[in-house]
Structures are given as structure tokens and as C-alpha cells.
Amino acid sequence: VGVYAMQIAMTEAFKMKLTVEEADAIFGRPMGIPKTGVFGLYDLIGIDLMADVLKSFIKELPKTDKFHEVAQEIPLIKKLIETGYTGRKGKGGFFRINKDGGAKILEALNLETGDYSPSKKIDIKSEKVDLKKLINRDDKYGKYAWSVISKIIKYASSLVTEITDEFNDIDEAMRLGFNWSKGPFEMLEEIGVENFFSKIDNYDGNKFLENLAKSKNENFYGERQKYTKIETLGKVKRKAQSIDGNSSAQIYQFKDYNIVEFTTKANALDYDSMDALKKATDKPLIIIN
């Protein structure tokens, strides 16, 4: 779901001719997503590593999975990888730091020309606006937000019963795994069930959405689960025993589980990071950075 969300945010930005700054400004804090957005997150993870992730999903997911619709190779991304622009760990990516002349200037990639120019700060005046207002805006930002959010909700809901029987498990995975402040179904509840269904064209055979539309239940989520305070991983790590590691990650053992801590610049993932994860999977695993 998380990778699908990244891909739909990227492909829609290309389709709607948004700049990378505009896309990240919308697919970011206004939607309860970290400020790296989509293009900044691609740079952080590594554009080449994301290409490998997509190839893996294309190979493993059934042909009927709608992920395939957003996983096609983009020529500009292929060119970036071939020329060493793999993100923060490389010469740059969708963003880069230009040090010519002594000053450090943040530059952004033009998705149409492939050229760099000084990055522009985008103020869409939606930092404190709720999702319902954001998707109802009658401008390119509102149209982009709605297109991305609606497709994420459709995709996530199509996986209910296939990957989990409880839809809130998907929300929790997105909060914990991608650091979103709200998952797809929490977004749906914030948008409003009636408002959502008034804006979509069809259910695409989605049983979850069909049943929800029939129920007309605006508060389908119910009461949220409350969590008790737990010990931080930073404190746990200080008590753990270092058992292995490499230039990109360190492996610790604590009680009956392993901990992997990434140590690369900006926590960028590379092949040594993946090797450390592979070595640590003989026990229950916690990943920190």
C-alpha cells in the first residue's frame, strides 16, 4: 500500500504536469504524510533501490493487482539511474545540492525537460486545512490531492480480506511503517463517506466500498484503540549486545530478538543494508534508524 501510494503520487504528478515541489507540498503534511513527500522520499530511499523494489513487486504480485498500473518504467527515472543521479546517496535525484560558486543551492528537477533549476518553496495554504477542504479545492492542487487520495483508498480497500481481515491493520501499518499520521481508512473517515462516494465514478468491483456505500455509515471506524507508553528503542539499544554489522548497518541482540540500526547518510538504503537485514532475520526483528 505504501509503495502504491508513492507510485500513484508520482505518476499523477507526471500526468498533471506538476513540479516536484508542488507534488511534495501536497503529498506531504497537508495529507498527514512526512514532508519528504514522494520525490523527496524517492531521493531518500534511493531511486535505484526503488526501481529494484518495483521489479520485485511486478514479479510477485498477481497480474490482476492494480499495482501494475502504476509500476511501469518512467524514461526520466531510467535516465537518472543510468547517469548516477540515484538520490541523496548519489549525485542528486529529483533534488540536488549545487555547490558551484561556493554556495550551496538546492535545485529541483524539471519533470518535462530533465533540467535542474533553483527549488521554489510552494505555499498551497493547506498546512492546517482538513482533507475534505483540500480535495474540494477547485484548482490543480485540489484535483491532484483528490486523484491521489481516492486511488489510495480504492487500492487499500481492495486488499481487505486479501492481506488482512481488519481494515484498521492497514492504517496501523501505514502509520508505523511510513510514518503517516493517518492511514487510508482514517483519511476516508475524515473526508466523509457520503462526500467520498459523491465524487467517485465507480467501485471497480471493490466489495469493501460497495458494502460501505450501502451501509451509509459515516462513523465506520468506531472508537480508536489506545496504547500504553513503552520503553524507547534508543534505551533498549543501549542494553543490547552488538553481534554483527557493516558500513551501512549495525546488528544488535536483545533478549530473544534482533535489532538492526541503519547508519548510512540520511538512512539511505543500499545493498549492505539489505544484507544486514537478511542476517538478522533468524529472530524476531526490530528496525531503527
Predicted regions: what is each one?
Residues 1-288:
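N-terminal glycine-rich phosphate-binding loop for ADP-containing cofactors
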